[in-house]
Regions:
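Short loop/turn segments that flank or connect secondary-structure elements
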Residues: 1-19, 24-62, 66-71, 76-366
Length: 366
């Protein structure tokens, strides 16, 4: 068990928020009898390739049907997945607790001790963890064997050490540009000693960041687009289509209220100022230690048929992740004036991190 991400953290659950209730929770077999007996009309099967039992959402796309005035009506019987938020238990060749930074309560430095809460959640999830860990260990063993056979294996701990030693590069547009180029050109790239790009092609960088961010917003289904809970506890949603972004707010009844449109090309890529850069570097270091981030890189390598060296895949993925985040920061500033300082970067992370944790991975969240 690895608790390093939550050591020293305090986490609260703001009463006005309710953002986690926009996520449709799975109902485990042992939880099903309560809902089947008392609320059978609110038990549903999800759509998709791997359907599961879940609680219904208001109008099929809003918050959970049990959320009323931002309070849960079945709080004492809420599902395991509701209880776990904002903690994510990731199974690889070990279990690592990761903290969802889209939860505003993770930023205030008040509330309950995160390690104590995590340990209680892990104890409650022991049967599921045992099975998930057994399966994920085998997946990782097979993945590493495939990497070695293809000649693309590198020591993950060394990759992490390199990023840790050079984290500031991933918060600098000149270095990001260079790293992204090298990751696609060099057989096995190295970032130690590289120099930043001095003649930046801003049009290409803006296009890269825009495409990354808009890809996640390209759905007309509110369940499939990023959600940003702002400081006033509004559930903001952004949908991209035909080169435009629509900003809407989901209300407590499950209806979308239109706020504004913007042509995506009119949103210019901005970079954090000195204070914002510090927050961004901290986030890079957080991602660098997450097993789920490493697992998402491994998933990309597997989908690409083990063509790229693990070094290029890892450094390149970190760089494009930051580009996505920077463009989202720029978009929030365009619509809401959040800025590019420490607060602006924090708001962008709050907007982004849940999607980051939802990225495909070879491991599993328990």
């Amino acid at each position: 068990m690895d608790y390093s991400e939550v050591v020293g953290k305090l986490v609260s659950c703001p009463e006005e928020c309710g953002m986690c209730c926009l996520c449709q929770p799975e109902v485990l077999p042992e939880e099903r009898p309560f809902f089947k007996k008392n609320y059978p009309q609110f038990l549903v099967r999800t759509k998709g390739p791997n359907p599961y039992n879940a609680l219904a959402l208001k109008k099929g796309c809003g918050s959970c049907v049990f959320l009323e005035n931002r309070r849960c009506k079945v709080y004492d019987h809420r599902t395991a997945y509701c209880r776990q938020y904002p903690y994510h238990l990731y199974a690889s060749d070990r279990i690592k607790v990761e903290l969802d930074l889209s939860c505003r309560g993770a930023w205030y430095g008040t509330g309950n001790d995160a390690v104590s809460e995590s340990k209680a959640l892990i104890k409650a999830a022991e049967p599921r963890i045992e099975q998930a860990l057994s399966e994920s260990k085998e997946v990782y063993r097979e993945f590493f064997a495939n990497c070695k056979e293809a000649g693309v294996y590198q020591d993950p701990s060394m990759l992490r050490m390199t990023v840790s030693e050079n984290a500031s590069m991933f918060a600098d547009l000149g270095y990001l540009s260079r790293i992204m180029d090298m990751s696609t050109i060099e057989p096995i790239m190295a970032i130690a000693g590289i120099r930043p790009e001095t003649n930046l092609d801003m049009a290409s960088l803006e296009e890269a960041g825009r495409e990354l961010a808009m890809d996640s917003m390209s759905s007309s289904d509110p369940l499939s687009v990023p959600v940003y809970c702002d400081k006033d506890w509004n559930w903001n949603m952004f949908m991209a289509a035909n080169g435009r972004i629509e900003w809407s707010v989901m209300d407590d009844e499950g209806d979308l209220q239109h706020k504004a449109f913007a042509n995506a090309e009119n949103i210019k890529l901005k970079v954090p100022d000195a204070d914002g850069r510090k927050v961004l570097i901290d986030y890079v270091n957080t991602l660098n230690q997450r097993d789920s981030f490493m697992g998402s890189v491994f998933s990309i390598m597997d989908m690409n048929g083990y063509e790229d060296d693990m070094t290029n895949s890892y450094f390149g993925s970190m760089a494009v992740t930051v580009m996505d985040l920077m463009w989202r920061m720029s978009m929030l500033d365009h619509f809401m004036g959040t800025g590019v300082g420490a607060e602006g970067v924090r708001e962008a992370i709050i907007f982004y991190d849940m999607d980051r944790l939802d990225a495909p991975t070879i491991g599993a969240f328990v």
